[in-house]
Amino acid sequence: ENCYGKKNFFMYKYNGIQPGILTNHADRIEYAEGDYKLLDGVYLIPHKTVGLEKIAKKVNLYVKDNGKMFPDDFAHEQSLVFDTPKGLVIFNSCSHGGPDNIITEVLATFPEKEICAYVGGLHLYKSSEKEVRELADRIKETGITKIITGHCTGDEAFVILKEELGDVIEQMYTGMEIEL
């Protein structure tokens, strides 16, 4: 990976996976492009939204290409989607491309389905109260009945989302069992 966080005007800090992992374990890695069916009912869905670099610039996430830094387009990030009898369940790590973009992408991929749950960080720790409340309104429109967030949602954003979404949202913790 070639992922970096911008520390200040001139400094970037590498924040990708440990260098060498991909080459050292190339025989164990299968690269997936586009919508990818892992097995019946389990899919990897990539970003399809154009312009995600705007989000990356706001939260200081960059990639290096030919020695130059560019805002990340998150093309390398995917969501793991399970098709269950109760609806689709989205698993994502930090949702760098925006949780509402991910929801839109999954619904476009499975237009006849509904999303029942979203599990993963929402990467809102640098978002304003207004942005978080607007996201909550968009989430309400989807009919999602369970959201389990990770650390990168941010404490302040979680409190606002809890006010707006009530029992629909809860924080993930070690050892948590998820029942849908």
What are these regions (language model features)?
Residues 9-16, 34-86:
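Active-site-proximal loop/helix segment associated with metal-binding centers of metalloenzymes
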Residues 4-8, 126-129, 178-180:
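Short, charged, surface-exposed secondary-structure boundary motifs
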Residues 22-23, 37-41, 160-163:
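Short loop/helix-cap segments at secondary-structure boundaries that form the rim of catalytic
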Residues 1-35, 48-56, 140-148:
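Active-site HxH/HxHxD metal-binding segment of metal-dependent hydrolases
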Residues 28-32, 43-45, 168-170:
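General small-molecule cofactor/ligand-binding pocket signal
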Residues 35, 173-177:
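Glycine-centered loop/turn motifs
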Residues 20-26, 68-73, 160:
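Short, solvent-exposed secondary-structure boundary motifs
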Residues 73-79, 83-90, 94-174:
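Cap/insert and terminal regions of metallo-dependent hydrolase folds
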